[in-house]
Amino acid sequence: MDALLQLKGIDKAFPGVKALSGAALNVYPGRVMALVGENGAGKSTMMKVLTGIYTRDAGSLLWLGKETTFNGPKSSQEAGIGIIHQELNLIPQLTIAENIFLGREFVNRFGKIDWKKMYAEADHLLAKLNLRFKSDKLVGELSIGDQQMVEIAKVLSFESKVIIMDEPTDALTDTETDSLFRVIRELKSQGRGIVYISHRMKEIFEICDDVTVFRDGQFIAEREVATLTEDSLIEMMVGRKLEDQYPHLDNAPGEIRLKVDNLCGPGVNDVSFVLRKGEILGISGLMGTGRTELMKVLYGAMPRTSGYVTLEGHEVVTRSPQDGLANGIVYISEDRKRDGLVLGMSVKENMSLTALDYFSRAGGSLKHKDEQQAVGDFIRLFNVKTPSMEQAIGLLSGGNQQKVAIARGLMTRPKVLILDEPTRGVDVGAKKEIYQLINQFKADGLSIILVSSEMPEVLGMSDRIIVMHEGHLSGEFTREQATQEVLMAAAVGKLNRVNQE
């Protein structure tokens, strides 16, 4: 089968770094090509070379059988290559239709915008994606998941022959993911080629036909997905066997440290649970069931309307995140780029931001040596891959950004560490490093709450698991009781089993 798009022998170097060396990628009509590799493997650089953001140092790009060079995203888009970025690229103050057709508005014979036609076309695109809202809605009123679907509708509006999807389901619910997969299958039947960049093995084996593996900027292999297992694919990605993906630590938890009684707040109804010293408590449930809201009410980022929280026997009232930090409760957000990190600031500044009290003199000036020492220690402990602590954090891979976000929380010396989706957007190698760090915190006696949409992660790492359904607690299970089936039954409200201590 002839490829729609073929990149061969692609080299790209930056000062001191060879980002791509002999990289290759083929995209075939009517097939989905997964592009996989650890963070820093060269996937993003390859996409930037393809779309003309970067100029390749060597190699060839064949588009529809002809040697081609794109001089920027506009030229590749007009040629028929659409890309859906992981970072949303929408204007919240405009409607869905205005975002989809921005700069390409329909005009009538009098030169005025044909609003009726534009909204009708946009509604048609949304209907193709099985979405329940109309295109006259403001983008800013949509959830992150729905905004992602608008991005997909926008690319579909270009009638692209090849569509690149970069972690497209990262913020989508299961229903939205099913809708996306239905659309991908429709696009395949129309003869379009899809590049599907993802860390999610389950999705790759469900929706992709072929897979291309990158490692350290090099092309490793192209295979049919049907010929692989998850383990063999991961081994190609990391270049080593991944023994025991979830390294659980069997240390018995200690006495009760945190007690939550009848907690209520936005999206949270009458939730009670306990957390012990040296325990990992998993929080499971479907998206939108109140898991993140519960954590934010506990931490002080959302208002508590009723209920009691005691920490080491003393009542805690958290009206703000500052109250949470002051009481020894740290929350690491699921959206590290919006709530967690300041991307334009350095690794050092991000890591020490919430712990400046520890590095300040009585007059308010900073003890820079102490700050540098502490940041350096955490960089070594967490194996953060960065040229220096002065590097802008936005230039680090997702896994290294997440390590910095967790390190920042630990700098305040907390008693309770809340990790909300700690491995989202993180490659398989960095995931294991984060799991090992979590076990280290547990061994040191830290109390950890692990919120995750990945059931194997919750099952593999937790000592005990509670499940949320529609703002309520619908189940509480020991590690031995918990299975994927039991957690899913509780998550959809078919099972209600809560053990109160």
From Swiss-Prot:
It is found in: Cell inner membrane. Residues 5-241, 252-495 form the ABC transporter domain. Its EC number is 7.5.2.7. The keyword Cell membrane applies. Disulfide bonds: none annotated. The keyword Cell inner membrane applies. It is a peripheral membrane protein. It catalyses: D-ribose(out) + ATP + H2O = D-ribose(in) + ADP + phosphate + H(+). Keywords: ATP-binding, Cell inner membrane, Cell membrane, Membrane, Nucleotide-binding, Repeat, Sugar transport, Translocase, Transport. Belongs to the ABC transporter superfamily. Ribose importer (TC 3.A.1.2.1) family. Part of the ABC transporter complex RbsABC involved in ribose import. Responsible for energy coupling to the transport system. This is Ribose import ATP-binding protein RbsA. It comes from Salmonella typhi.
